[in-house]
Amino acid sequence: MQIKAEEISQIIKDQIGDYETSVDLNETGTVISVGDGIARIYGVQNCMAMELLEFPSGIMGLALNLEEDNVGCAVLGSVQGIKEGDIVKRTGKIAEVPVGPAMSGRVVDGLGKPIDGQGPINSDLTSKIEVVAPGVIARKGVHEPCYTGAKAVDAMTPVGRGQRELVIGDRQIGKTALCVDAIIAQKNTDVHCIYVAVGQKKSTVALVVEALRKHGAMEYTTVVAACASDPAPMQYIAPFAGCSMGEYYRDNGQHALIIYDDLSKQAVAYRELSLLLRRPPGREAYPGDIFFNHSRLLERASKVNDELGAGSLTALPIIETQAGDVSAFIPTNVISITDGQVYLEPNLFFSGVRPAVNIGLSVSRVGGSAQCKAMKQVAGTLRLDLAQYRELAAFAAFGSDLDVSTQAKLTRGERLVEILKQPQYQPLPMEKQVTILYAGSTGHLDSLPIGSLAAYEADLYDYLEANEPSVFTDLVAEQAFTDGIKEKLNKALTSFGETFKAIKGLK
């Protein structure tokens, strides 16, 4: 068989013509050691800080230490399938999470991947987990209230939109309960909520999600869960991921509320990471930049100015203390970063005062700016009455014969403490809060036994809704106690008080 030269040259030309010159160019590195959730990688020369790196098994890593001859990478998953010599690819992307309305009602991990079994999240919007906080010029003073639904908090230590209010206290005294109630209280408002669970048991997170779902709050809430069994890097980045989700609403002229539950466990996760990366330890073995870690997270909560849409991101970080020690390293750090704190005390909790807010140690640095006029009108006398009550109660314990004015102050104080108690999952709107506080501070409760006040409060709301609904609607419209509202309310309180005493057989 004779092969013609022309045919051969034609075949070669065809092959050259069909040849695709695409080059798959990847910058890769090699794993030189792996263990305890940290991989050391050689060769990724142009790697950026906080860049995502991809391991052969599809697991992602986060570049934290950029050293001369290697990169210290936190593995965001199990290290079981990673071994020395594995090829690692650069993604060229800084760690980011999906954001936007599609996240509402979902439970996700620290990278924004769904873990609730409800299918993938269809969101084209993403945001970097590390974003610089708005500058001074971009901000506006906090001036709108963000109601938590808890009478003790909204009256004494009010939270405004764009504020950072720390919730601090020992374990198991209602910190999470207070914050979950704050989420439920946003039900009929335009506030989107993000709940970040760090280092919690999965069963605890499931209970919170179930409570939110039961009260119709999951519709506007995103839960970011980095549980106790998740790797330390996931627990470290979860609050930043949740913050990015909240910032989407703030930057689009909307309002968001984020709960960090809790930052003590995030600090422990960051300490673990830092020590494994051989960073020098400082006080209590925390790294030197632990303060910066918390401040750059909490500074992202802000109220932005009108030119940027007047949106806000309000933060309620939680810190767990050991035996009430608020002078430990992490509590003092976060107290100094935030705009006030709500201090929950075990003694109050176990004596039946729930929420167990210690009014003396709790403070809001925004104060009256975050309250409507109606709340200011009742809260001013309330704080004074309670302060006098606490002072007199200490002395009254030693003597039995008290003069009439002292006895009156003690009577008033006992009733005010009682009406500040509130059951879990029952946050109150502003108009109901100011109504019962007004009744307490004007003496309408002084003649009632303490044990009957819970029933009095519940029946009072029903009575007003049935017989004087204009009191609530006027309070919402005016946001203040006008002479007309006071007159109507005083009349209703007197009438209801007589009816209540008659029904309960009280004198």
From Swiss-Prot:
Top EC class of this enzyme: translocase
Pfam families membership: ATP-synt_ab (PF00006), ATP-synt_ab_C (PF00306), ATP-synt_ab_N (PF02874)
Protein's UniProt keywords contain Kinase: no
Gene Ontology terms for molecular function: ADP binding; ATP binding; proton-transporting ATP synthase activity, rotational mechanism
This enzyme's EC code(s): 7.1.2.2
Keywords for this protein: ATP synthesis, ATP-binding, Cell inner membrane, Cell membrane, CF(1), Hydrogen ion transport, Ion transport, Membrane, Nucleotide-binding, Translocase, Transport
Entries under InterPro entries matching the protein: ATP_synth_asu-like_sf (IPR023366), ATP_synth_asu_C (IPR000793), ATP_synth_asu_C_sf (IPR038376), ATP_synth_F1_a_nt-bd_dom (IPR033732), ATP_synth_F1_asu (IPR005294), ATPase_a/bsu_AS (IPR020003), ATPase_F1/V1/A1_a/bsu_N (IPR004100), ATPase_F1/V1/A1_a/bsu_N_sf (IPR036121)
Membrane topology: Peripheral membrane protein
Binding site for ATP: G169, D170, R171, Q172, I173, G174, K175, T176
GO CC terms of this entry: plasma membrane; proton-transporting ATP synthase complex
SS bond partners: none
Annotated site residue numbers, Required for activity: S362
Keyword Transport carried by entry: yes
Domain of life: Bacteria
Annotated compartments: Cell inner membrane
Reactions accelerated catalytically: ATP + H2O + 4 H(+)(in) = ADP + phosphate + 5 H(+)(out)
HAMAP family: ATP_synth_alpha_bact
Function: Produces ATP from ADP in the presence of a proton gradient across the membrane. The alpha chain is a regulatory subunit.
Subunit structure: F-type ATPases have 2 components, CF(1) - the catalytic core - and CF(0) - the membrane proton channel. CF(1) has five subunits: alpha(3), beta(3), gamma(1), delta(1), epsilon(1). CF(0) has three main subunits: a(1), b(2) and c(9-12). The alpha and beta chains form an alternating ring which encloses part of the gamma chain. CF(1) is attached to CF(0) by a central stalk formed by the gamma and epsilon chains, while a peripheral stalk is formed by the delta and b chains.
Family under the similarity heading: Belongs to the ATPase alpha/beta chains family.
NCBIfam families, per database record: atpA, PRK13343.1
Protein name, as recorded: ATP synthase subunit alpha
Name of the encoding gene: atpA
